[in-house]
């Protein structure tokens, strides 16, 4: 039996905390949940599509994941709570095709590689706002500044998808949402290296409004960023965020979201007097990040429209205590984004998704005067969604006032072989416009062309993640061209070509009512096609296993995680090797009544010695414990 549901933006459906089931959802489209497909949930008598069976990264509008041919993974609120802790990379590394490199402890510069793509080729959004740092040399987002507190949902699309998202979506799209569960909640955690993490949130909803607010504070004495260092490099951050909506009519509503984070971290570098040997220094960095969006959304059975204006700004300052209290270097980046997106339902099976957007970005540094750029784009996708076959194809045109126009195409399809089996495939192009820093900063080159990519993947899936068992195998390839590289002293040039290809395996099973297991494995080759060398910090083998058991002892839950990473190289010449490693985490939690939960974990139980960036420290055996409350 099928139920037609209008999931209009920021409609919040309350779900019991610490329990599997439908999660808070936001959308702007008509969707079908299918009882036979095992993707319907029941909340307060309403039929809802389960949160991990919907996607926003495929087209920019909400869609059923089983109607899409692209590779998409979802991390839910329950997943984040089971994993525990402020380090979001511990959740992301469970996903296939994902590896990361970090220059020290929590809060340090963190790069996320999706299927071997450069970290800055991953588009990151928070509540629909693009949050890249336009003043960074390559314009990416530093995931070291993004903690899990206040995050309610994470979605990752693996593969080029500039058709829907424009510039930056070469490696994929990472979309995060603020937690908007109804009720009040809070958590406190303390552990190794004097690490303290506190978070609080509040969710309200009525007939015409929803509101989710949250904030948190994290601090740690940390570890030495320099692996051989004698002094620790501390980190602290406080953050605030919120998301809400108000219905003006049954079909039209106002939506708004905002986030602010203030961070400070010590780091190591090259101390005097010769500045040529890596070691302990007295340097630190402050980062202030703000983002927000205000818009309108209209939804009916025939037409969905959304429009809004968003702002993202990042300010960084670098200090050296040995040189005084004034900053030695500062950067400022800002981007304003305006967009309109929509879906016209032509019939029960045919639809057109469309949109237009404009970005105005600027950057400046201590040594570089302010520079600006404008990027305008429009796209359209024609979709067919039958009972068994779904096809989507479209095109996009972007115009950059500094580097000219660029056209992007893409297509994907899904075919349901039976109730539980489906085939899927996608082909997509990606591009990334040169950053203002690459055009006008130190070593800048105004003749740079956009980086481009062409990606293909094909897969076979069985079951659903929320069912008794699921399995997926995916083959993928991505060819990238015009990659921007820096050569001292000449500067930036379009010189590189790269290929990344491999296979992803993902599966899980609810073995018994109380025991479940999830696992993933990726084999990846990512090479520079000019030199034949492996791309730096891209391991060929990555695997993760997570097992969870809810015991009959008063709700006591036990869990274990295993992360295996193969060998890689730290540099483009493949001279410095990074040895593979294995990490084991043990987790536990127990409810104390209806409103209180105790939890704890031990990370790197075997005290493995490893590095993700040569010369930079990583955590040894560490233990943490905390408490959660809800009411």
Predicted regions and their residues:
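Short, acidic, small-residue-rich periplasmic hinge/interaction motif at the N-terminus
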Residues: 21-81, 89, 119
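Periplasmic-side early beta-strands and strand-to-turn transitions of outer-membrane beta-barrels
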Residues: 162-163, 175, 182-185, 189, ...
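Membrane-embedded beta-barrel scaffold of Gram-negative outer-membrane proteins
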Residues: 209, 300-320, 416, 423-424, ...
């Amino acid at each position: 039996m099928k139920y037609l549901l209008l999931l209009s933006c920021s409609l919040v459906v309350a779900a019991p905390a610490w329990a599997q089931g439908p999660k808070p959802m936001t959308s702007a489209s008509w969707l079908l949940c299918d009882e036979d497909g095992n993707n319907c949930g029941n909340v307060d008598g309403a039929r809802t599509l389960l949160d991990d069976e919907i996607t926003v990264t495929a087209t920019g509008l909400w869609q059923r994941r089983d109607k899409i041919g692209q590779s998409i993974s979802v991390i839910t609120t329950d997943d984040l709570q089971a994993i525990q802790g402020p380090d979001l990379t511990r959740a992301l590394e469970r996903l296939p095709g994902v590896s990361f490199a970090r220059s020290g402890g929590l809060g340090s510069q963190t790069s996320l590689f999706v299927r071997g793509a450069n970290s800055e080729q991953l588009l990151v959004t928070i509540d629909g706002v693009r949050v890249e740092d336009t003043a960074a040399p390559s314009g990416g987002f530093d995931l070291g500044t993004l903690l899990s507190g206040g995050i309610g949902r994470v979605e990752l699309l693996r593969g080029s998808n500039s058709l829907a998202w424009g510039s930056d979506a070469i490696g994929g799209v990472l979309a995060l949402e603020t937690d908007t569960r109804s009720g009040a909640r809070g958590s406190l955690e303390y552990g190794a290296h004097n690490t303290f993490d506190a978070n609080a949130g509040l969710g309200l909803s009525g007939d015409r409004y929803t509101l989710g607010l949250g904030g948190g504070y994290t601090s740690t004495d940390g570890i030495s960023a320099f692996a051989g260092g004698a002094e620790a490099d501390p980190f602290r951050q406080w953050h605030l965020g919120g998301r809400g909506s108000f219905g003006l009519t049954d079909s039209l509503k106002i939506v708004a979201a905002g986030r602010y984070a203030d961070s400070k971290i010590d780091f190591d570098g090259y101390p005097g007097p010769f500045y040529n040997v890596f070691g302990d220094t007295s340097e630190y960095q402050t980062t202030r990040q703000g983002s927000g969006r205000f818009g309108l959304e209209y939804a009916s059975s025939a037409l969905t429209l959304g429009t809004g204006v968003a702002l993202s700004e990042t300010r960084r300052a670098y200090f050296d205590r040995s040189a005084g209290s004034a900053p030695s270097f500062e950067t400022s980046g800002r981007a304003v984004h305006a967009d309109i997106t929509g879906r016209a339902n032509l019939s029960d099976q045919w639809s057109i998704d469309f949109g237009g957007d404009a970005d105005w970005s600027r950057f400046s540094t201590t040594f570089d005067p302010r520079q600006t750029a404008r990027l305008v784009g429009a796209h359209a996708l024609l979709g067919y969604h039958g009972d068994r076959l779904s096809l989507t194809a479209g095109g996009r045109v972007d115009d950059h006032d500094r580097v000219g126009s660029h056209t992007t195409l893409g297509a994907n399809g899904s075919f349901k072989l039976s109730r539980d089996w489906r085939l899927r495939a996608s082909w997509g192009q990606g591009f990334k416009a040169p950053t203002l820093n690459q055009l006008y900063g130190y070593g800048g080159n105004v003749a740079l062309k956009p980086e481009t990519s062409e990606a293909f993947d094909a897969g076979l899936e069985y079951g659903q993640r929320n069912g008794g068992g699921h399995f997926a195998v995916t083959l993928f390839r991505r060819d990238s061209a015009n990659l921007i590289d820096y050569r001292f002293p000449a500067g930036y040039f379009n010189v590189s070509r790269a290929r990344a290809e491999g296979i992803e395996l993902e599966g899980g099973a609810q073995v018994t009512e109380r025991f479940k297991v999830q696992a993933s494995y990726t084999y990846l080759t990512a090479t520079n096609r000019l030199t034949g060398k492996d791309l730096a910090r891209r391991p060929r083998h990555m695997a993760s296993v997570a097992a969870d058991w809810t015991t009959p002892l008063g709700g006591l839950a036990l869990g274990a995680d295993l992360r295996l990473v193969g060998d890689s190289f730290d540099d483009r010449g493949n001279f410095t090797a990074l040895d593979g490693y294995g990490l084991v985490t043990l987790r536990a939690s127990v409810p104390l009544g209806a409103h209180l939960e105790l939890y704890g974990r031990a990370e790197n139980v075997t005290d493995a010695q490893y590095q993700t960036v040569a010369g930079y420290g990583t955590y040894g055996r560490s233990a943490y414990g905390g408490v959660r409350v809800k009411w």
